[in-house]
Amino acid sequence: MFNKFSKTFQYGRHTVKLETGEIARQASGSVLVSMDDTVVLVAVTVNKDVKPGQDFFPLTVDYYERTYAAGKIPGGFFKREGKQSEKEILTCRLIDRPIRPLFPAGFYHDVQVVATVMSLNPEVDADIPAMIGASAAMVLAGVPFMGPIGAARVGYANGEYILNPTKTELTTSQLDLVVAGTESAVLMVESEAQQLPEAVMLGAVVYGHEQMQAAIKAINELADEVNPVIFEWAPAAEDTELVAQVKALAEADVAAAFKIRQKQARSQALGEAWSKVKAALITEETETLRANHIKSLFKELEANVVRGQILAGEPRIDGRDTRTVRPIAIRTGVLPRAHGSVLFTRGETQALVSTTLGTKQDEQIIDALAGEYTDRFMLHYNFPPYSTGETGRMGPPKRREIGHGRLAKRALIAVLPKQEDFSYSMRVVSEITESNGSSSMASVCGGCLSLMNAGVPLSAHVAGIAMGLILEDNRFAVLTDILGDEDHLGDMDFKVAGTENGVTALQMDIKIQGITKEIMQVALDQAKEGRLHILGIMKSAIDAPQELSTHAPRLYTLRINPDKIRDVIGKGGSVIRALTEETGTSIDIAEDGLITIASVSAEGAEEAKRRIEEITAEVEIGKIYEGTVVKILDKNVGAIVQIMPGRDGLVHISQIANERIANVADHLQEGQQVRVKVLETDERGRIRLSIKAALADAPQV
């Protein structure tokens, strides 16, 4: 019934097993990947026919984490998984980025990759198994895919690289880097680091690429055993006559367009050049494939013009040389009521970045598959269509926005103050108001300055820069601070963020084979040069963290005996609720007894702090207190007197007066202020009070 194949290999300290032929047999290719109890099923499906009018490669990648994988039932009213989490979306992008450039130009068949996490070892993240599984399933689907690829996570601690570190190991690692590539070349890097030197970062990329060869070898061996059916597809034969026609119609216009420095005017000129080609070569009767081919030839012509100019040493599209950063303008304190804000403009890319400070209660609660946790630092990136002069849908963030926000967040994490030194939660929002390349790096620069404007004591300034590459045979040019067109027409998108001391985030996407270690070294060195230039400008705008905004909450902390926490909270939360309402504060209580009071008003916070100190103060035996009668007990037993907020004691009828009394109510009423002396507390914490003892101790007049 089943024709099963499997392949096992050692991957660092983990054992990885690839299985196929038993599950999801109707998919074009499917693989079950196991890595030390983390199990991911990856299925690839390819449509046999191209949709009419299709003019791009429709690859979709979806990654899902099922809660049963961790032995959990989803929380909330609906007991099933809902929309994808941020972690799932980021993993979709990790899988997609190294796979997409390995498909040939002109392949327009629908390809769908679905990765499902079915079992999770909390120590082994499912992203690396999912990437390996997607590569293997793609090979088994028989599509024209120039793979397989391998993927590896690299950590760095005590001067040594760690292959596929566990979750526990990552807590002490100075680096969390994911690298993917083919047998001969690196294709994708995603990382965050603790201000590491460029040499260490490059070494991690090379180390990861060397180690992933074990995964690539296993996939190839599995494919040899399975011997998959090859998908029938052949690239369109080169039509030299059509190439010549497109060139004759548009080359001069395209070359002239790329001499225009302003983006909108340049885009308009390129649009007119395309319209000229379209009018001459495409009619209503033209087949979709031919129309697509003409469009791709026009795009190829654009690339050839730009690339040829740069490799010939001519100025770039906007007139710069290869190493120059675009002009930068910085304005701080832009938004009067925001806790921190900065307008960061670099050429035609602009980000308006704001920072909001909050309390522990404002932290993001993340219900992850491996367990719930909170995050005190949030960075959200918004890319409205007006930023590129276009109209479009506004709504929930797209995958690209989530990915760019995560990259900017990675860049800043390394310089954030420790929780014990700065108790605030922090939310940074980057509104991209103009875009012509490198908006995520503008978010890094603006985010750093916005945090400092809000008074967050960052340990260093962080700047980010996007690098590009043009590679033809043995000639190459590394471009500093790339434009949007240079990103699309180049061979590499290489984003580096860091401080003066080292790299905090690195993201790389390579569209071609053949990027060598030497080229990456040149790119890193040139990126450092650009980063230091930007850091100098940023420091001239804000050289150190500023004073907290008057609109930001003030945090006050005190520590109490953990046994007293219940007294501060009160029965059913009555005490803390009254405290927050009456003082206008927000109060957070940690299990270790650390209390954080947040308030815009210093007076309210001080009052809350005073009352908490009263509540948690130890009752002293023999001390006299001013108390309030809160209850007259039935059967003439006595009265309950409150001597501190939340602390009551019993005054027995025999302790009310020196003489014998018959009725408690004749001497005491609820709300009456009385002086009482603490006689004793029992093992259950109950307090015995005496009015007559307090009278006896009163000074004689």
Swiss-Prot record:
Kindly state which reaction or reactions the protein catalyses. RNA(n+1) + phosphate = RNA(n) + a ribonucleoside 5'-diphosphate
Lineage top rank: taxon = Bacteria
User: Under the GO molecular function aspect, what terms does this record hold?
Assistant: 3'-5'-RNA exonuclease activity; magnesium ion binding; polyribonucleotide nucleotidyltransferase activity; RNA binding
**Which residues does the UniProt record annotate as the domain S1 motif?**
622-692
GO cellular component terms?
Answer: cytosol
Alphabetically ordered keywords of this record: Cytoplasm, Magnesium, Metal-binding, Nucleotidyltransferase, RNA-binding, Transferase
Q: What's the Enzyme Commission number for this chain?
A: 2.7.7.8
- Matching HAMAP family: PNPase (MF_01595)
Name the UniProt record assigns to this protein: Polyribonucleotide nucleotidyltransferase
Per the UniProt entry, what species is this protein from, by scientific name? Laribacter hongkongensis (strain HLHK9)
Gene that this sequence comes from: pnp
